[in-house]
Amino acid sequence: MDNEKRMTTWCRMWNEDPSLAHDLMTDDCTQWSDHGAGLDTVVGPHEQERFVAGYRARHVNIFSPRVLADAGDRFAYLWDVRKADGQVLTGIDVNHLKDGRVRENWTFVAERRCERSDPEPGAAGHTDPATIEDLCRQWVQLRNGRAELAKDVVTGDFDLFSGAEAAGDAHGPSELADLIERQAETNDPPVITIHRQPIVDPGRRHVAFLWTAETGADGASVGGVDLLTVRSGRFARAWSLTGIRPFRY
């Protein structure tokens, strides 16, 4: 099973067949959700099957995968979920594998749906992994207040989707720089650092990484995730989702 199949099967597990957990997860697979601790105690496929069966008895939600970043033993993807009342939300999952099965999972759900169309599969070509990793470092510097980097880090038609609200979106380097400057002017803006290792997909020119945002006043932190696409050596699209709790691992 490749990672494209894994993301589709993971959605099917939640949509229709909880027993698929046994094909997807290691016996000690752990999960983390950005909005609550409900998955913290769900370890391995047996507990996952029971949990999902109970979840499906209470919720009629349909998950659909959208954009994949595939690094072999790690992958992340953008997805949508349609609720019973017709509301659609966008989310991102990050997965680390062990022996071909998911060992660690992180799940983020936005407050709204990203309505922009997804990049065309296979249209991007190939970018050197070191270039993508360097862009990630510059992106973090940008998010930490270096607004002047926007013109060098993103394309002229860059588009940022914020999972929280439309006020956090940005289109093009000028809007992005203005957004960063406004955020830097707030009281005690958080400092963002990459958590674990970026998921670099040079073939698709996609990258995703977990990050931690920590405030200086009380040291409180929350986990977040960014998924980005690369074109002509710069970021062209970005989806950024922020949780309300710190990472457990």
Predicted region positions:
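C-terminal and inter-domain tail/linker signature
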Residues: M1-Y249
